[in-house]
């Protein structure tokens, strides 16, 4: 594949109309791409769990996984739009996604419900840690709008994490 027609390389940060210097936005875009990659990988993981979940709690988990990948898809959209607005290029190449994601990518295969949820919780917790660091970083760099965006995503990510914790309560998802 050739790069004919390439207008901006992934590592290139263009000037923006938001009044933020590229010395600032380059740091912000790097962090946002880590978050974007992590959410794109998590989207695929939730979608796989939605497709493959089985067992006594099928319906509630099937719906939860669908709601979760829908919410994560919204985060992907918002982060990608913000990256573009800041003059960056949203990450999309599968190998780059794997490189930038902040959590261990689940292996291929079908897992039992408890294991699926444990993998999802570990991913959400890693993303929460990343989001908290990014929120502090963008605030220190003077980008309040990105901070506001990240805080909204942080709240929704926390909510998914504690919902997963409820599914993992000791009296649920027992093996027969």
Curated annotation (Swiss-Prot):
Name the chemical reaction catalysed here.
Answer: 2 Fe(2+) + H2O2 + 2 H(+) = 2 Fe(3+) + 2 H2O
Quote the cellular component terms of the Gene Ontology held in the record: cytoplasm
Top enzyme class of this protein?
oxidoreductase
UniProt subcellular location: Cytoplasm
GO terms, molecular function: DNA binding; ferric iron binding; oxidoreductase activity, acting on metal ions
- What GO terms describe the biological role, i.e. biological process, of this protein? chromosome condensation; intracellular iron ion homeostasis
Q: Which Pfam families has this protein been placed in?
A: Ferritin
InterPro entries named among the record's database cross-references: DPS_DNA-bd, DPS_DNA-bd_CS, Ferritin-like, Ferritin-like_SF, Ferritin_DPS_dom
Tell me its cofactors: heme
Report the function annotation for this chain: Protects DNA from oxidative damage by sequestering intracellular Fe(2+) ion and storing it in the form of Fe(3+) oxyhydroxide mineral. One hydrogen peroxide oxidizes two Fe(2+) ions, which prevents hydroxyl radical production by the Fenton reaction. Dps binds the chromosome non-specifically, forming a highly ordered and stable dps-DNA co-crystal within which chromosomal DNA is condensed and protected from diverse damages.
- Name of protein: DNA protection during starvation protein
Organism (species): Synechococcus elongatus (strain ATCC 33912 / PCC 7942 / FACHB-805)
Q: Which gene encodes it?
A: dps
